[in-house]
Amino acid sequence: MEKKNLLNVIKKVSFSLFIVIIYVMGLYIPLPFAEGTKQYMEAVKNTPISILGAFSGANFTRISIFSIGLNPLMFSMLIIQLLSFTHSFGFDALSPKQVQYLMQFLTMIITIIQAALLVFAFTNRRNGLEDFEMILILSAGSCLVVWLCYRNMKYGVGASAPVILTSILNGAIPNIISNVKLLLTMKYAWIWLAALAIFILLLIKFWLAFTKAYYPLKVVNPSLPASSNLMTVPLGLNMAAMMMYMVGMAILTLPLMVGRYFSSSSLINNWVFQASFSAVMGILIFYFFTFVNFDPKEQAKSFRNNHYYIPNIAPGRPTQRYLNRLIWIIAFPGAVLNAFQLVFGLYGGNFLGNYAGFAIIPMNVVMITMFMGGIKDQIDTILFPYRYDRLLKDN
């Protein structure tokens, strides 16, 4: 049994590594007929679209068959979550299989739209057949990446996390190397390098602690003895961060894709407007996924059905209203911190000059830490039976 459990872990990790290898290979397979125009390459260089793409498994810097990545999937996930959370259009009547089909259909439609926008962006020379083939190949490549992530969810570790983590590292490692080279040209270079390393370590420590931080909601359980009938329901202060970055980044790519059809002086291409829009969207998406993770209405109903209650708060609607207010308050620090880090990572380079590359480091560090933490937690869960077998053997 012990060998069987350990073998299962090795198989899952190996399958995830196999998925990553396929993804990396696809990033280096060029898209046929694609010729990046000067306008497109300048847009990639002067806008944060390449950064935005990396956080959803896309790669707009290198035009390949996997350039779109998981970007459309993030859009469809948000739409499904909105329909589910708001109970709109009779969504509750759908079976899980129907929801899955709807999500796949939405992903396909969004994939085709994004593929068309990308094709029209990186080439000015129009050829109907070539454009169609490029859109078809980009769509097929994105669908393959999505399918690989679904397979990884079943047979591997981390679902889409290994693909997105690889995409982030693909951009983060060259950025860090170039920043280190820049620091080495400065006076007291080793002091600056040490300061950068300490800053990164402190940042990792802070975000690990903040991710685990929670508000202890006290709930009375009448079935327990009166002396110890208070239970603690942990409300995470940063429970929506990962979804905010993944989904938010995917959404923010759309205005940048559409922006090329407007003049450079238009509002949509103004970086101050883009930064403000990103901040607002970041906060809204953070709050949305916080409410998705902890739905006050469903929690109030669950408390009432299990005969739990919050001290001095009546069950039912009063509890729901109390939880609503509580979530708005306790999620505020996480919403502001993550939105600030998002905006600074995307647009901090506009006022850092020669040191623009340092702006993205904090956001990269946070996302790498979160994804690696999520993968580690899943591996620990898979390893639990193996550790349990060893414990029985020792006894």
From Swiss-Prot:
InterPro entries per UniProt: SecY/SEC61-alpha, SecY2, SecY_dom_sf
Membrane topology classification: Multi-pass membrane protein
Transmembrane helix recorded as keyword: yes
Keyword Transport appears in the UniProt entry: yes
One GO term of the biological process aspect: intracellular protein transmembrane transport
GO CC, one annotated term: plasma membrane
Locations listed in the record: Cell membrane
Pfam family, one: SecY
TM region(s), chain numbering: 13-33, 63-83, 102-122, 128-148, 157-177, 190-210, 239-259, 272-292, 326-346, 355-375
Keyword annotations of the record: Cell membrane, Membrane, Protein transport, Translocation, Transmembrane, Transmembrane helix, Transport
SUPFAM superfamilies with a match to the protein in the record: Preprotein translocase SecY subunit (SSF103491)
Major location (coarse): membrane
Assembly with partners or alone: Component of the accessory SecA2/SecY2 protein translocase complex required to export cell wall proteins. May form heterotrimers with SecE and SecG subunits.
Job of this protein: Part of the accessory SecA2/SecY2 system specifically required for export of possible cell wall proteins. The central subunit of a protein translocation channel.
Database matches in NCBIfam families: acc_sec_Y2 (TIGR02920)
Family: Belongs to the SecY/SEC61-alpha family. SecY2 subfamily.
The protein, known as: Accessory Sec system protein translocase subunit SecY2
Phylogenetic lineage: Bacteria, Bacillati, Bacillota, Bacilli, Lactobacillales
